[in-house]
């Protein structure tokens, strides 16, 4: 009798396990998106467009005429979708942020560059357009509120004195899938800042998290530097 009852239990367990497997097999496979870039940004093949020339980006319009060439530098990169995946992307949103190297480095508020739904995409800026809308995040050491400074000079003809050699413009990406869901590989922290030094922190801005990957394929960097001779 005990043997028969034990056999019955084993049969019941086996049947339950089989039924469970069958039910699980009917569930849709999860989308493993948490750390999977869907595009790979690529720098321009033109080496002059692979960085931002410091002197030409910083110069006033008058000083620019004394430089050679007397034009603002251009930064350019492109990207295409990775069609090897089953994930269907409808739109790629591109953002830019200003990063000041230091200890610790700071990253300013991000600004939307554009939303793209036709691929491949080539994005090209002259330095004035690149600096437009960007802000430097300043964290005082005296404990007062963090504040932001506009990078581009208020007078379009004036020098852009706030940029330095070694500064970076960081481009990051978000994907909107065909089902409407959003993929975010570069976490954002909403941060309260002041719009003036010493003022109250009453403005909230979206800032890249400190742990954000800023290297390809997660992001693209435009380095402000001198030409390599």
Residues covered by each model-derived region:
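Flexible, surface-exposed loop regions and adjacent strand-edge segments
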Residues: 189-192
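Internal, hydrophobic beta-strand segments that form the core of beta-sheet-rich folds
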Residues: 163-187
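Acidic/polar, low-complexity intrinsically disordered N-terminal segments immediately downstream
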Residues: 3-5, 22-121, 165-167, 181-182, ...
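C-terminal motif of bacterial Sec signal peptides marking the signal peptidase cleavage site
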Residues: 16-20
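Sec-dependent signal peptide hydrophobic core
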Residues: 5-13
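Signal that preferentially marks extracellular ectodomain short beta-strand elements
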Residues: 122-167
